[in-house]
Amino acid sequence: MIVLVLDQIPPDDPADDPRPRDAEEPGEGSPVPRPTPRAVVQSFGMLAASVLVGVLAVMPAPYAVNGPGPTRDVLGEVDGEPLIEVEGAPTYPSTGELRLTTISGVGGPGYPAYALNVLRGWISPSSVVRPVEDVYPQDVSREEIDESNAGLMVSSQENATVAALVELGYEVPATLVVAGTVEGTDADGKLEEGDVLTAMDGVALPDYQTLVGRLADVAPGDTVTLTVTRHARSEDVSVVTSEREGGGAQIGVFIDPSFDMPVDVRINIEGIGGPSAGTMFALGLVDLLTPEDEAAGVVIAGTGTIDVTGAVGPIGGIRQKLAGAVRDGAAWFLAPADNCDEVVGHVPDGLRVVEVATLRDAREAMVAIGAGDADDLPTCTAG
């Protein structure tokens, strides 16, 4: 705004000045108008509101507040570098986007929530507020939480790489090292930490997928003979299998596989922890290593853990991730089948959800969506 200031020209003769000589200059010594009661109330109300907001902003509250976090296109770049880098195999461009989704939150060790955060969380339809003890153990530190999340992220990247390469037909050799046994199973006391599984019932175990395939043919209670390398010597150990949670047979050991990757994959991402991006990492790698433009210009978001067999697992914060996806332009969302009960009734306008249980499901959904032939894709339903 431009303000023009006009200088007053003094009269040539004092008599030409119409003001009495003893007249006061405007505003000099004149009485100040008394504020009205309404003005006093309004001023007091504004002051009280400001004080209240200030108090709420610094008053700790025993809650954790989670809302939609940032999304990242796994086919895109981070600081000028591809989010997924591949060496040892050709990669192909894609015109679509595959967005991993996250949640952001305050509350818990190292990041306390304040009353204002909690109030905003209660008001926002896309946020959730829970007692902090329902989210974090009482005796855990922020450093321990961050370390755990970082480890889970690294594990999810390795699982995603193996699952994607196997999906594309690569062989991924693995050394199957026993990390421990399940208490109460027959393997407890028979197998030792550091044992390397090399065969089962005389069939070599060159990779993790072979072990999973062999166990699929075994019923709980069957006896299997495991050939292990222990202290540089080969031994046969007979183990009675037990029932695995979710069905099927298990040996009763924890396996820490060491993979010999046929392709070098590097995932460049910081500031995000946990395992829930695994499915989108795997799907992005599949698309990059496939000549076809499978996403074909569509923005697809999603979430889900993944294991080396390609099984998609449930995650937390699905509703917040749905909100973050539609906020960042996604038209489709790939949701773990085990999260479907939380999805129903909470899908934002403009977003279509596809239920996936495996990496194969996710890949087929991506291809169908990119081809414009997605009408028959399964969606989440109640029950």
Enumerate the predicted regions with their spans.
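Conserved PDZ fold ligand-binding element
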Residues: 187-210, 214, 322, 329-333
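Terminal targeting segments of Actinobacterial cell-envelope proteins
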Residues: 1-41, 126-130, 139
